[in-house]
């Protein structure tokens, strides 16, 4: 999310779709599909520190107006928890993300959505920027979609699937520039990812 915010002034179109699946073995598989405006993608090639939006190893489909970047990754639940804890003291953008084990079967996620009060918001994303309105207009219709899947979604303020195994968060990309106040302060979900018997997991 950090580089997404920092590079927003360069975006003519930015759609993001990310899927995270937490398995019974505590392995998280992630697939992220990002549609970048051609101008943004070309600018990224000149800013090595920002290329995490579409890294060299990403699967790319390039067109005259946009580039589709698909990345896949695997990590463990313990690694994700450690990363969130590290960010808490180092990164003002991601410091409010929470990944907490509830017990041996479930995990609780909290993703902050209070974009109005993000600490360290870049000056380019303020209404003082003469290009602000043009940037906001260019992002109309673009969305950030994040899905979490596990054995069962026990509770969430997101959209839970009919089979109860996944939950979806949809954020209009323009919310990062012009928060409407219609989003909750945070997205929360409690996911059950395995069944443990009397003898443990």
Each model region followed by its residue ranges:
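Sec-dependent signal peptide recognition
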Residues: 1-7
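Mature, soluble, non-transmembrane domains
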Residues: 61-201
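Buried hydrophobic packing residues in well-ordered domains
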Residues: 18-20, 26, 146
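Post-signal-peptide N-terminal segment of Sec-exported extracytoplasmic proteins
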Residues: 35-60
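Post-signal peptide N-terminal segment of mature Sec-exported envelope proteins
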Residues: 22-42
């Amino acid at each position: 999310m950090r580089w997404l915010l920092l590079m927003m002034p360069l975006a003519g179109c930015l759609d993001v779709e990310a899927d995270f699946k937490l398995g019974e073995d505590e392995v998280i598989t992630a697939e992220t599909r990002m549609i970048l405006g051609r101008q943004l993608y070309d600018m990224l090639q000149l800013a090595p520190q920002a290329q995490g939006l579409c890294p060299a190893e990403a699967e790319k489909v390039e067109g005259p107006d946009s580039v589709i970047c698909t990345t896949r990754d695997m990590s463990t639940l313990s690694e994700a928890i450690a990363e969130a804890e590290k960010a808490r003291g180092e990164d003002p953008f991601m410091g409010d993300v929470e990944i907490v084990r509830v017990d041996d079967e479930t995990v609780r996620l909290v993703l902050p959505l209070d974009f109005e009060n993000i600490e360290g918001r870049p000056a380019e994303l303020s209404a003082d920027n003469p290009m602000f309105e043009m940037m906001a207009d260019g992002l109309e219709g673009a969305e950030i979609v994040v899905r979490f899947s596990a054995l069962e979604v026990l509770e969430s303020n997101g959209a839970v699937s009919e089979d109860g195994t996944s939950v979806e968060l949809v954020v209009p990309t323009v919310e990062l520039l012009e928060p409407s106040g219609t989003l909750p302060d945070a997205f929360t979900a409690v996911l059950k990812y395995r069944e443990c018997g009397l003898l443990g997991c």
